[in-house]
Amino acid sequence: GLSEQQRHAFLHWVKHFRLANPRQLKRLHNSYNLLRHFYGEDGASAKPADNIGDLVKTLEFPLMITLFALEYLNSLDDPPLRTQLKSSLRGRTKLAFEDEAQPKIRQSLINPAVITLVNRAMPGSQLHLVDAVEPFVLPAIEQNVEAPANVA
């Protein structure tokens, strides 16, 4: 099961990413446990955090946050925004959070702290966190919106 610190972090990041569906939460819990068993314990430092504030400041569980960030992205209804935010998690694009032309990005829950945490390789590996975690996340539903054909 989850340690006390992991439970506190789980609740914090569920609230941060506004994930509330009970089935979704159960799936995320199970996916996180699978990630921990597959890759090993999730990046907890040797010195445990003293309280939830320290835990959040140190962003102690990168697999968990990557899992939740990808879940959040895959739930977005705006495919171009989803693509741009996912690219930022991989460090491929720099988001202009201060740019008035991009209000959707500023309103996104993918903030600079999340990007900084997720844009890294797995410990002891060259595998990017996003690439490591993505197979454990329910994929986004992609819809091709085409103009209806003229029916005569």
What are these language model-derived features?
Residues G1-A152:
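The feature marks long, low-complexity, polar/acidic/proline-rich intrinsically disordered regions embedded
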